[in-house]
Amino acid sequence: MFRRRRGHDQDQRHPGEQAGEGSRYLLREKLLSIGDDFWIENDRGDRVFHVDAKALRLRDTVVVKDMGGTELVKLQKRLLRARDTMAIERGRDTVARVKKAVIAPLRDRFTIELTEGGSLDAMGSILDHEYQITRDGVPVANISKRWFRVRDSYGVAVAPGQDDALVLAVTVCIDHLTD
C-alpha cells in the first residue's frame, strides 16, 4: 500500500488536495523525540505534513504544518471536561471538536462535531487500533496500525472529495485521546 516511488511524476497534487481515487498517508511518530514531533508521508514516501507537538504546555497542543511551514490546523486538548475532547482550529476558528464516548466497551467511539454543520463518527477496535471514520454511514477514511510492523505508525486512507488535512487532524486526535 505504501510503496516508495520517489520521482514518480504522474500525480503532482499539493498536500491536502484530494485525488480522484482518494489519498493515502503514513503517520510515523519518532520514538523518544522531544515533543513527539513527526512527519506524515504520502503513499510515494514523500513528506507532506509536519506534526509539531508542543512540549511543556499546560494543555496538549499539536500543530499540523505543510512543507513550507504554514500552519494548517492546530489541535488542543480541552482540560476539565466530563469526557476527553480535542478542538481542531484553522486560524482562530474552531472547525471541529473530537469527543471520546464516555462508555464504549471493547470499542473506541468518537464523535467529530463540525462547526460548519453535521458530524463525523469514528469507531474502532481498542486492541487492534483499526478505525473507520464515517459521515452518515458513508466511509470517509480508514485508519490502521495493522498495516505496519513499526510501533506508533498509522496508515490512513482518505476517500475522494474529503478534506485530507482535517481527516489527518482527526487521526492525530484519536491517537492522543486513546493514549
Language-model regions: role of each:
Residues 1-179:
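Intrinsically disordered, low-complexity proline/glycine-rich segments
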